[in-house]
Amino acid sequence: MSFAGRRGMMAAGATAIILGGIAMTGAAHAQECDTVVFSDPQWTDITSTNALTGVILEALGYEQKVETISVPVTFEMLGAGEVDVFQGNWMPAQQKFVDAAEKKGGIENLGVNLKVAKFTLAVPEYVAVEGIKSFADLGAHGEEFDHKIYGIEPGAPANQLIQKMIDAGAVGLEGWELVDSSEQAMLAQAKRLERGKDWIVFLAWAPHPMNNQFDLTYLEGGDDYFGPNYGGADVYTLVRGDFAKACPNVGKLLDNVSFTLDMENTMMGLIINDGMAPNDAATKLLKEDPSVLDAWLEGVTTKDGGDGLAAVKDALGV
């Protein structure tokens, strides 16, 4: 369903209430839930989790639509009711966006979908062996790094943290430059510089296949900006404020779904290294290890009220 279509449906519903003097029926709620709109900031981990959830949703009779939008726009669209689901709420990095959205009452947090992630600056091991082990080591080696830190897409919370460090002149970074790009462009640049053993410092995180593609050293000492334990993070699932009430069956699925580092690393490897389409990768993973399905589908039905677990297993052929 397009955003215009969603707004049109809501307007039509409002007109019906005014003209008929009746409350919205369960059937209207069900129609609103037919298509579930997810956000993807073009992060491969979120592409992966969206695909895993989407394969399940479609087997249950729903349609998934994925919008490629930045994190700031995601929060705006959640608040406006134009995006239903965001499975990439990395905390505490996105705290300011959550605080602003909660003040407006535009989101609901369904809980953690991934524990024990990390998210901070890293360097290749060949740089680390030259003595770069900490944020505090960067400032004295500006020339070797060309005074650049490579980040992801413009406006991303992590980029904002890096820019805040530079603006404050923290750890000797005064005069450095944040290079905005994208996940893919950042890693391509890291690969190019690695070939010549040129120095680079860039944003890194786990889960991600980059941890297998590069011999990385995560930098210590970034607690004031990225948080303790190398930016140790939990990832949460957010929905628009009224979604779980309006669409309780899908809400139950989203509440049930959780991921592991191994699962996400496998998914991202299939997408990045093997060139698989995300939904094909998700189908492959779930067919090869359907053990998560019982927990994910507990209390969940098909769109028309049938046995959800049986429908998903039948669709996957397991």
Predicted stretch roles:
Residues 118-128, 232-246, 269-270:
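A bilobed periplasmic-binding-protein/Venus flytrap-type ligand-binding module shared by bacterial periplasmic
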Residues 34-36, 44-45, 164-195, 201, ...:
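An extracytoplasmic/periplasmic, membrane-proximal ligand-sensing/linker region
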Residues 106-155:
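A conserved helix-loop-strand patch within extracytoplasmic ligand-binding domains
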Residues 76, 83-87, 157-224:
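Ligand-binding pocket segment of bilobal, Venus flytrap-like solute-binding proteins
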Residues 31-45, 62-67, 146-150, 254:
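Short, well-ordered beta-strand elements
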Residues 53-60, 142-177:
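Ligand-binding cleft/hinge of the Venus flytrap
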Residues 1-14:
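Bacterial N-terminal signal peptides that target proteins for export
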Residues 27-38, 57-58, 140-146, 296, ...:
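Immediate post-signal peptide segment of exported/extracytoplasmic ligand-binding proteins
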